[in-house]
Regions:
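Extreme N-terminal starter segment of soluble prokaryotic enzymes
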Residues: 2-6
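Glycine-rich phosphate/diphosphate-binding loop of Rossmann-like nucleotide-binding domains
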Residues: 7-24, 28-30, 148-220, 232
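N-terminal glycine-rich phosphate/adenylate-binding segment common to multiple enzyme folds
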Residues: 50-154, 241-243
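Buried hydrophobic positions in well-ordered alpha/beta secondary-structure cores of metabolic enzymes
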Residues: 12-15, 68, 129, 171, ...
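Glycine-rich phosphate/nucleotide-binding loop
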Residues: 46-49, 107, 225-328
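Glycine-rich phosphate-binding loop
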Residues: 61-83, 205, 211-269, 350-354
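Mobile late-domain/C-terminal helix-loop "cap" segments
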Residues: 291-375
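N-terminal beta-loop-helix "entrance" segment that forms/cooperates
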Residues: 32-58, 224-226
Length: 375
């Protein structure tokens, strides 16, 4: 029997609850499709940081490295300075495990209403592929004369051909299994050096994919076109900063951050990829059972796809979508069940759901990611 070893980082706030709910769906998929899941819990997050003063140590990195994938719930705690856990733990793992490609689906599922008029499941199914380790997020820079009227801040942005090529190549391979339309999003009329490097890489990689159409949209224009005409896009490839911003915009279009999943992908398979819902730790509702585990379940579906378990991924995605369509509210006390109960409903639905009811499985993101899974 195929066995996948998952490292589980529940994290902070609602993170442990939504992760536990998502794992119920993963285990149901394993039972249905004949593979096994073994999990190891890791105590990383605010409590561990407050005890040790370290967000991520080398021993934890090496222990995590021995797993096939990492499931992360959420991090963030009012007792910890904002950014410490996000940079120290999440960005730290992305860099340590060469998770150079971030995958953010923007899909409106049947029964979920978008806040944007005219958006429907028929015209909202795109993927944002974001370079995950470079750009302005490398952290380089300095500030001179802080706290004075003469303060000057310099923030460095680094863009390299190898990292950009790896991201663009991944995007072309993915879009080849979908509708074969790739869009580069940048701001090359202003960020002329980095923007031109991105365009050069896209043009070069495109020569190897003659059946894929590709175009370009400025980042500011994308903020107009994506919400008003999401059906125009199939796969959007972009840099770290623009990808971070656009994927949150996309989450709004698809019904909110509470439904948004993500994958931090190591495309070469040299270290585990990491899967996490986009939402935060929501410490104000932690322990109340008001958090919707759908984004965590959908992230777990991405994890199964990344492990090559296409059928399990499709079933978990379809089960989460099916349960979402039945909820009287997408979060809070009016959701129609607490976090664990919604998780159980998703897991129960996995056992007999038909993925074709939410779209063509052959053109789905789950199928595309499973085909790209390192062997």
């Amino acid at each position: 029997m195929r066995t996948h070893h998952l490292a589980v980082i529940g994290g902070d706030g609602i993170g442990p609850d939504v992760t536990a709910a998502a794992l119920a769906g993963v285990r149901a998929a394993a039972d249905r499709y004949g593979f096994a899941i073994e999990t190891t819990e890791f105590d990383l997050g605010a409590e561990a940081y407050l005890r040790s003063g370290v967000a991520l140590d080398e021993a934890s990195i090496e222990a995590l490295r021995r797993h096939d994938a990492v499931l992360l719930g959420a991090v963030g705690d009012p007792r910890v300075t904002p950014g410490v856990l996000e940079r120290g733990l999440i960005v730290g793992l992305r860099v340590a495990f060469a998770q150079s490609v971030n995958v953010r689906p923007v899909r409106l599922y049947p029964g979920v209403e978008s806040p944007v008029a005219g958006v429907s499941p028929d015209n909202c199914d795109l993927v944002i592929i974001r370079e995950n380790t470079e750009g302005l997020y490398t952290g380089g820079g300095s500030i001179s004369h802080p706290g004075t009227p003469n303060a000057v801040a310099i923030q460095n942005s680094i863009t390299t051909v190898p990292a950009t090529t790896e991201t663009v190549e991944f995007a072309f391979r993915l879009v080849s299994a979908r509708r074969k339309r790739l869009t580069l999003c940048h701001k090359k009329n202003i960020l002329v050096h980095a923007g031109q490097l991105w365009q050069d890489v896209v043009d070069e990689v495109a020569t190897r994919y003659p059946d894929v159409e590709h175009d370009y949209v400025h980042a500011d224009a994308m903020c107009l076109h994506l919400p008003l005409d999401p059906g125009r896009f199939d796969v959007v490839v972009t840099d770290n900063l623009f990808g971070d911003i656009l994927s949150d915009l996309g989450a709004t279009v698809q019904g909110g951050l509470g439904l948004a999943a993500s994958a931090n992908n190591n495309p070469r398979g040299t270290a585990p990829s990491m899967y996490e819902p986009v939402h935060g730790s929501a410490p104000d509702i932690a322990g109340k059972g008001w958090a919707n585990p759908a984004a965590a379940a959908l992230s777990a579906a991405l994890c199964l796809a990344g492990l090559g378990e296409r059928d399990g991924a499709l079933a978990l995605e379809a089960a989460a979508a099916s349960v979402l369509a039945e909820l009287p509210a997408l979060a809070g006390p009016g959701m129609g069940g607490d976090t664990a109960e919604i998780g159980r409903r998703i897991a129960d639905r996995v056992t007999d759901v038909d993925p074709a009811k939410i779209g063509d499985p052959e053109r789905s993101l789950m199928t595309g990611l499973a085909r790209l899974a390192p062997r």
